[in-house]
Amino acid sequence: PNVDIYNACEQFSLVKKYFGKTSGNPVFHFIVVYDAKSTWGNTYERAESMSRSIASYFADRYQIVYGIHNKPCYNKYGKCTSLYHAHFIMNSVSYIDGKMFSGNHSEIYAFLNYIERVTGDKSWKIKYGSGKEKTSEGLTASMQCD
């Protein structure tokens, strides 16, 4: 919500260069999977509204963009699991003061609590990692911005 999606990578890089923080993890990538049944239903408008609210958690300090996918509702057992999920890409360097986002446990769990409040769903689970190890879901600190 605070970046031109067509120039996000360039804008992220300019902030990093301004603060001299060009090494390390370039972005923080996380995915929120919305539960079509218990959370809010299956409309794109609701998914977009939730995604905007979730992105606003970081938007006052970090540049962030998101995209929403609509997936078929059936898993291999024929049950509806989720129609929508959103990918969020956040600059790892704050545009306010150049502070790097650490993604430590306290930051992640504070964010998880925020998602629970926004969605009204208390069943969130979170796993995160570099993506280079075992498969991760939920929040992932990986992705290159070239």
Give each language-model segment a name:
Residues 1-146:
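N-terminal nicking endonuclease/strand-transfer module with a His-rich metal-binding environment
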